[in-house]
């Protein structure tokens, strides 16, 4: 069987979570001995990613290229489902939901328009997949988009290999945040929590990896309150592994995180984790309550208490080899293959 994955890919000028998902999932299907192709309208994309061919399309060439590839299954993200009309009639169409368009983050107009588009696409799909039960619930209950199955995401193969083989020791009292520096991500509440801890005689050091529009304001707050916070800006994958490895506690406070790939990254790095009580991460962190603090992310005092509790605990997350494997994309791809084989029953069987 041949699968085409439609969506963005990373380039020298573009990097995004969905692009990474597309490339890693494609490699996962290839590892499971499927024929796979990446199809994108990203300009200046490489001709291959992880050994998977990349076909670049535009409004003129899309029909010709997709017909040439003639995939049996086509999995699309974001607006790329518009190219389904060029697939052969019996191709299986899968739409993958990476989250939801909440008004507080995207604005009322974009949220309503994007959700309407996704509802229309979902009706044209044979299957709709989501990255968490939280994403599934929100899309179903608030946007009228029903999901067939949930598939948790993996980390990149590069990160997976590096983090399991690192020898960087943990730094006592070190906190790590990775992500955009915007209010929706809760970075301000983390810094306010650090002031609470400092005022209580329990100073912590924080490494902030990422950039965003709130950076200048956050830097001024840190300087004014003399907090031990290091703004790293955008960091390379290699450096990110180092910071995850040395961090004792990882903090991320977005209450509406659809999945939160940073949490599996932190878990594999054996970080203790402070996170909200809501979001997709709750589904796979609930089994680690001794090393995870679920907090009211809007309360700096609650965040500070979570950090303090974990900082005093000598316990680190213990992960089984089987559980670690679930964060590999060849495992994610195999789960999708098994799901489709069962749903195909006797009408069609999906084999390599």
Describe these PLM feature segments.
Residues 255:
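Aromatic "clamp/platform" in nucleotide-sugar-dependent glycosyltransferases that forms part
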Residues 234-235, 242-247:
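Short alpha-helical donor nucleotide-sugar binding micro-motif in glycosyltransferases
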Residues 136-155:
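Helix-loop-beta element that forms the nucleotide-linked donor phosphate-binding surface
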Residues 288-300, 307-313:
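Conserved acidic donor-binding segment of nucleotide-sugar-dependent glycosyltransferases
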Residues 111-128, 137, 141-142:
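Membrane-proximal helix-turn-helix segments that form the acceptor-binding/catalytic region
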Residues 20-24, 173, 177-196, 213-216:
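A conserved mid-protein helix/loop that constitutes part of the nucleotide-sugar donor-binding site
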Residues 219-235:
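Nucleotide-activated donor-binding/catalytic signature segment of Leloir-type glycosyltransferases, i.e.
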Residues 106, 154-172, 242:
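Acidic anion/phosphate-binding donor-loop and adjacent secondary structure
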């Amino acid at each position: 069987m041949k699968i085409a994955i439609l969506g963005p890919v990373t380039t020298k000028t573009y990097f995004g979570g969905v692009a990474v998902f597309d490339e890693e999932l494609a490699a996962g299907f290839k590892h499971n001995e499927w024929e796979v192709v990446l199809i994108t309208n990203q300009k200046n994309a490489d001709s291959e990613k992880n050994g998977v061919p990349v076909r670049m399309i535009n409004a003129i060439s899309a029909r010709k290229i997709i017909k040439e590839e003639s995939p049996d299954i086509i999995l699309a993200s974001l607006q790329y489902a518009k190219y389904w009309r060029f697939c052969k009639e019996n191709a299986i169409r899968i739409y993958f939901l990476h989250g939801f368009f909440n008004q507080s983050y995207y604005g009322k107009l974009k949220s309503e328009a994007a959700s309407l588009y996704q509802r229309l696409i979902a009706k044209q799909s044979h299957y709709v997949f989501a990255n968490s039960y939280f994403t599934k619930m929100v899309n179903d209950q608030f946007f009228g988009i029903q999901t067939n199955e949930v598939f948790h995401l993996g980390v990149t193969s590069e990160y997976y290999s590096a983090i399991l083989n690192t020898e960087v020791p943990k730094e006592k009292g070190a906190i790590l945040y990775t992500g955009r520096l915007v209010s929706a991500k809760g970075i301000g509440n983390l810094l306010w929590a650090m002031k609470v801890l400092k005022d209580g005689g329990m100073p912590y050091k924080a490494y902030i990896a990422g950039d965003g529009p709130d950076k200048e304001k956050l830097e001024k707050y840190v300087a004014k309150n003399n907090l031990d916070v290091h703004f790293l800006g955008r960091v390379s994958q290699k450096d990110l592994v180092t910071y995850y490895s040395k961090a004792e506690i990882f903090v991320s406070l977005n209450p509406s995180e659809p999945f939160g790939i940073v949490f599996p990254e932190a878990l594999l790095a054996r970080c203790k984790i402070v996170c909200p009580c809501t979001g997709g991460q709750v589904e796979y962190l609930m089994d680690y309550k001794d090393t995870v603090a679920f907090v009211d992310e809007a309360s700096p005092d609650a965040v500070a208490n979570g950090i303090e509790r974990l900082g005093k605990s000598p316990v680190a997350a213990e992960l089984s080899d089987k559980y670690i494997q679930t964060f590999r994309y060849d495992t994610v791809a195999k789960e999708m293959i098994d799901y489709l084989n069962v749903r195909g029953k006797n009408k069609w069987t999906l084999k390599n």
